[in-house]
Amino acid sequence: MRRFHILLLLGCSAAIFAAEVPGGRPPPGFTPSGKPLAPLVVAADQRALLASSDPKLARNKKLVFDFWRIVYEGGHMERAAEFMTPEYIQHNPNVESGREAFVNTIGKARPPREVAAVSRFPIIDIIAERDIVMVMWARKVRDREHPEQIYEMTWFDVFRLDAKSGKIAEHWDSSERWGSAGRPPGAEFFP
């Protein structure tokens, strides 16, 4: 549990990119002091991340992993009810709460396509504790001040599963408002 809370705290910090340094901002890929960012290490075998000595935690990880591949990436909104409660709570400021609202919003951006065996997004880790599953991703984005420059950052999605149904009941991520673009930063690099 301690590992989860530390990673969640670090994740929120990593996703907020607002450091200013004397003399200007360092280029993408560097810390505020000008040191190179540590390279992100993605999982070589995403399915290995689903393992747990606790069968409930393994099931929770698999449900979130399958939801992501089938519904979010695959665009199969007709299957959302298999994975999400009707009362799904959304903490992303760009999507309303409720399964139907998720389907309407995300479905517009993700037409159905073949479901991949693993996530098309590069996963760093999947961590589960109690009814919470957190997925850590590597993600490319353009620098806000220098759009021609691209850097890699971490992204975190946290899901709470309903104790009775075992389905996704709540979601958090570190998203800001998407603005006039109508899509998240880095969406052009989404697989």
Label for each model-derived stretch:
Residues 1-4:
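Positively charged n-region of N-terminal signal peptides that target proteins for export
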Residues 7-15:
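Bacterial N-terminal signal peptides
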Residues 19-78, 82, 86, 189-191:
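Short, low-complexity N-terminal intrinsically disordered segments enriched in polar/charged residues
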Residues 77-133:
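A solvent-exposed, acidic/Ser-Thr-rich amphipathic alpha-helical stretch
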Residues 84, 139-141, 174-175:
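Short beta-strand segments enriched in hydrophobic/aromatic residues
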Residues 91, 136, 169-172:
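Beta-strand residues in well-ordered beta-sheet regions across diverse protein folds
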Residues 136-165:
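Exposed beta-sheet edge and beta->alpha loop/turn motif
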Residues 154-188:
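Short beta-strand edge/turn micro-motifs at domain boundaries
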